[in-house]
UniProtKB/Swiss-Prot annotation:
Endpoints of the signal sequence: none
Gene that encodes the chain: TGAL10
Annotated DOG1 domain residues: 176-389
Localisation per UniProt entry: Nucleus
Annotated spans, Basic motif: 109-129
Identification of the protein by name: Transcription factor TGAL10
Family of the protein in this entry: Belongs to the bZIP family.
SUPFAM superfamilies named in the record: Leucine zipper domain (SSF57959)
Region ranges (Disordered): 80-110, 320-345, 370-389
The entry's keywords: DNA-binding, Nucleus, Plant defense, Transcription, Transcription regulation
Gene Ontology MF term list: DNA-binding transcription factor activity; sequence-specific DNA binding
Length: 389
């Protein structure tokens, strides 16, 4: 019996030690109540076989330890669970991104509407500016027409007040009026071309495009000279006096224009920087212009002297013939005006015949114009010519 008891003790004793880890959750009731040898009475005198059988029947089976490590490692062993966990972690992120996209859609729509409104406002301002410019141009044309009407009314009133037809002023040639209208249009077109030149320079236009703009500006000046030539054929005194210009411009006029040498002298500082060849060409052009101006001035002086001599020589003959003619019957009230009319008619006839000699001067001017050198800007680069335009 003594040998059987230790064997039973060896069988039942390890249970408390094995359950020591889980003593907080699973208390070993059998070990705490019955001691080291549970279910065995010390005063028992039964046989060893019966005690062993009773111990084996009554003794509880050993508790198995739960494998928490395997349970904790279980999610790491399954790929589907990892994917599910990643999906659970990413689902809030996708939800937030979709919410931000939904929230950004109204902002994008507002920005597009604001951009459309700004573009519409810009186009409206451009249309308003063009409309105002058209109104200003129309106003200037209307003012010019009003001036023409006022001038025509004054001339008609002066004609109506005159009593003697011989003292009437010469009628205004339609070519002169046409030149004044064309000159006003030419000035307006010149302003537009100047603005176009500046815009091309600021936009850094290419060579061919800029050259076309410069050539158009030069052709515009050629049209002015052609209009002057036609007006001079109608009324040379109108063109020579330059009544269509301002008082300051008329002070510097020379034969219905400005001296080319003076124009070159004013433009020369603006042509810098130039190469040595360009500077020599400009200087030679200025000297040639001065020689032609001197020749033309001498021709004008000779013409004036010829006209003065002709008028003085013919004045004696005219006055003698006018005095020798039988005087008209003296009217009662218009005697002074009739005598003045007779003298004025004689002198105006002689003046008209003398002014016929201006054809020589016209031929001389045409000769100079055909022999003129190219403009001073022809020696420069097209961009510098545009800057001077």
């Amino acid at each position: 019996m003594t040998s059987a008891a230790p064997a039973a003790a060896q069988f039942a004793a390890p249970a408390p030690a094995a359950m020591g880890i889980y003593d907080r959750r699973h208390h070993p009731l059998a070990a705490g109540v019955w001691g080291d040898h549970p279910f065995i009475r010390p005063d028992t005198t039964a046989s060893t076989s019966n005690a062993a059988a009773a111990a084996m029947v009554v003794a509880p089976p050993p508790l198995t330890e739960p494998k928490f490590e395997s349970q904790l490692a279980l999610p790491l062993q399954h790929g589907d669970d990892q994917d599910n966990a990643a999906a659970l972690q990413e689902s809030p992120r996708h939800a937030s991104d979709s919410f931000e996209q939904e929230a950004s859609k109204p902002r994008d729509k507002i920005q597009r509407r604001l951009a459309q409104n700004r573009e519409a406002a810009r186009k409206s301002r451009l249309r308003k500016k063009a409309y105002i410019q058209n109104l200003e141009t129309s106003r200037m044309k209307l003012a010019h027409l009003e001036q023409e009407i006022t001038r025509a009314r004054q001339q008609s009133a002066y004609i109506n007040r005159s009593s003697n037809p011989a003292t009437l002023p010469a009628p205004i040639d339609s070519g002169v009026v046409t030149f004044e209208v064309e000159y006003a249009q030419w000035v307006e077109e010149q302003g537009r071309q100047t603005a176009e030149l500046r815009a091309s320079l600021q936009a850094a236009a290419e060579g061919p495009e800029l050259r076309a703009v410069v050539e158009a500006a030069l052709a515009h000046y050629d049209r002015l000279f052609a209009a002057k030539r036609e007006a001079a054929r109608r009324d040379v005194f109108f063109v020579m006096s330059g009544v269509w210009r301002t008082g300051a411009e008329r002070f510097f006029l020379w034969i219905a224009g400005f001296r080319p040498s003076e124009v070159i002298r004013v433009l020369a500082p603006q042509l810098e920087p130039m190469t040595e060849r360009q500077a020599a060409d400009v200087q030679g052009l200025q000297q040639k212009a001065r020689h032609l101006e001197d020749a033309l001035s001498q021709g004008m002086d000779k013409l004036k002297q010829t006209l003065a001599d002709s008028l003085l020589a013919e004045a004696v003959v005219v006055s003698t013939s006018c005095d020798a003619s039988p005087p008209p019957p003296p009217p009662e009230e218009e005697e002074p005006s009739s005598s003045a009319a007779g003298d004025g008619g004689c002198y105006m006839a002689q003046m008209g015949s003398a002014m016929g000699r201006l054809s020589n001067l016209v031929a001389f001017v045409d000769h100079v114009r055909h022999r003129r050198s190219p403009p001073p800007t022809s020696h420069l680069h097209v961009r510098r010519r545009a800057e001077l335009g």
